[in-house]
Every structure is written in structure tokens, then in C-alpha cells.
């Protein structure tokens, strides 16, 4: 049985979820199971980072692009 406090929290969660512009990523860190092994992908200080060889030379890779697709509209935007 839900009490009134929990009902209010659920309603507040729905409100937040309907206004994604109120949510701001400061950091995000994941372990990505790639075809050639695991890769560490993170978003910090306004930029994506990956430990794969391709990212080192191009500042983007399939792992960071996949994270942007998975997160959809919630993907953090890189700063200039």
C-alpha cells in the first residue's frame, strides 16, 4: 500500500521526467564491452573521453557515438 508521501514522490518523479531540460550531467562513467575488449568511456568537464586507440587520434569513436545514441535527448552536450 502506498502512503501519501510516496504518491507525492512518484508524481514529482513524473514531473521531472517530463522536463529533461532540468537535468544536467556533470559526469558519467561507463564500462563498454567492445568487440576487441572492454573500454572505459566517460563524460567529464564538458567532453567525452574513451580509452580506445581511435579516440586518441580523432576525439570521437564508436563507443562515444553509441553512448550519445543510447542516451538520446539526454546525452550531455560537449562544450566548446
Question: For each predicted feature, which ranges?
Answer:
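Long, low-complexity, compositionally biased intrinsically disordered regions
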Residues: 1-80
Amino acid at each position: 500500500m502506498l502512503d501519501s508521501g510516496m504518491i507525492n514522490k512518484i508524481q514529482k518523479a513524473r514531473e521531472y521526467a517530463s522536463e529533461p531540460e532540468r537535468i544536467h550531467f556533470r559526469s558519467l562513467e561507463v564500462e563498454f564491452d567492445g568487440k576487441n575488449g572492454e573500454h572505459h568511456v566517460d563524460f567529464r568537464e564538458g567532453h567525452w573521453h574513451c580509452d580506445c586507440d581511435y579516440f586518441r587520434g580523432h576525439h570521437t569513436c564508436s563507443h562515444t557515438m553509441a553512448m550519445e545514441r543510447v542516451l538520446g535527448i539526454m546525452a550531455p552536450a560537449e562544450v566548446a
